[in-house]
Amino acid sequence: MLTNESLELILTKSQRCQRNWDLSRQIKEEDLQTLKTAVTNCPSKQNVLFYKVIFIQNREIIEQIHRSTDSFTYNFEPRKATTNAQILANTVAVFIRDRDDALGPRTEKEYAEGTTNGKIDIDEFKAVGIAAGYLNLTAHMLGYKTGFYGAQHGHDTLLEIFGKQYVFCMLGIGYPDETKHRRDHHFNPTLEGLKDYRYSSLSKQVHVEEWK
């Protein structure tokens, strides 16, 4: 059983984005099944279906997606950007919109407007956020590293791969390259001539209150 101390350590590490990977290894099949359980057994409003998840291990597709992610800006003027290397992970989980028209209405809005148009977008994004969080934490509890990608760029590539399906976000999951700092680009030191380039790391201060 996990102790509070060990769980807090996992929670702390789970927020960190891994930027390089050991691609000589593969995600264990039993772990992949557990990751699938994580995204299919998390809460959503009225247990409504909002998304589906594609777990990609095909390296050709993963590298195609990665090439389209040159949106991490490290210099604003003149603009210089590099790719989001977290997408080069051993496995990439892609969250895609999925609305089951066969479901009957579960809310008043769905009853009035139909089960497709009646869904509230904010409920959809909440559901995806919860599922992505479940997946991220589960991956870390299994011993993997992760990195989120918002999938807001490279639309032509996403259209080619996924068709007109709406992509919410992606999560790279896998084994880290133990020879590098986690924020070193996967392709360093050959990355665009940027020797020793390291992604920046930002912090946040979440205010927590306790009312008794």
Language model segments and positions:
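C-terminal helix-cap and adjacent tail motif
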Residues: 2-19, 168-212
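Aromatic sugar-binding interfaces of carbohydrate-active proteins
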Residues: 161-165
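Short glycine/serine/proline-enriched coil/turn segments at secondary-structure junctions
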Residues: 44-47, 138, 179
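N-terminal amphipathic, basic helical "cap/leader" segment at the start of enzyme domains
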Residues: 1-100, 208-212
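Acidic, glycine-rich active-site loops and adjacent beta-strand->loop/helix elements
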Residues: 99, 152-155, 177
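Short hydrophobic/aromatic-enriched beta-strand-loop microsegments
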Residues: 73-76, 166-171
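Small-aliphatic-rich amphipathic alpha-helix that forms the alpha element of a beta-alpha
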Residues: 39, 93, 109-160, 171
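Short, flexible, mixed-charge acidic loops at enzyme active sites
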Residues: 69, 104-112
